Amino acid sequence: MAKEAEMEFEGTVVEVLPNAKFKVQLENDIVIDAHVSGKIRMHYIRILPGDKVTVVISPYDMTRGRITYRKIAKKAEV
């Protein structure tokens, strides 16, 4: 039996929790718990409140997810 496909959502980090966990508010205003993927952790990428991130959620548990990408904020031109 094949695994069901994971779903990707865009969201904003609302709160930083201990042990590399975060509260992320998705585009549809649902707040979920998310942890950092291994590649982000391995490369010491910092995630702060307000960062835009991509979250992968399993269809089996829609309350938890995994942060797979942090969007780079555009710098304002002067």
Swiss-Prot record:
Its main location: cytoplasm. InterPro entries: NA-bd_OB-fold, RNA-binding_domain_S1_IF1, S1_domain, TIF_IF1. It comes from Mesoplasma florum (strain ATCC 33453 / NBRC 100688 / NCTC 11704 / L1) (Acholeplasma florum). The gene is infA. The keyword rRNA-binding applies. Keywords: Cytoplasm, Initiation factor, Protein biosynthesis, RNA-binding, rRNA-binding. The keyword Transferase does not apply. One of the essential components for the initiation of protein synthesis. Stabilizes the binding of IF-2 and IF-3 on the 30S subunit to which N-formylmethionyl-tRNA(fMet) subsequently binds. Helps modulate mRNA selection, yielding the 30S pre-initiation complex (PIC). Upon addition of the 50S ribosomal subunit IF-1, IF-2 and IF-3 are released leaving the mature 70S translation initiation complex. One of its GO terms (molecular function) is rRNA binding. SMART domains: S1. This is Translation initiation factor IF-1.
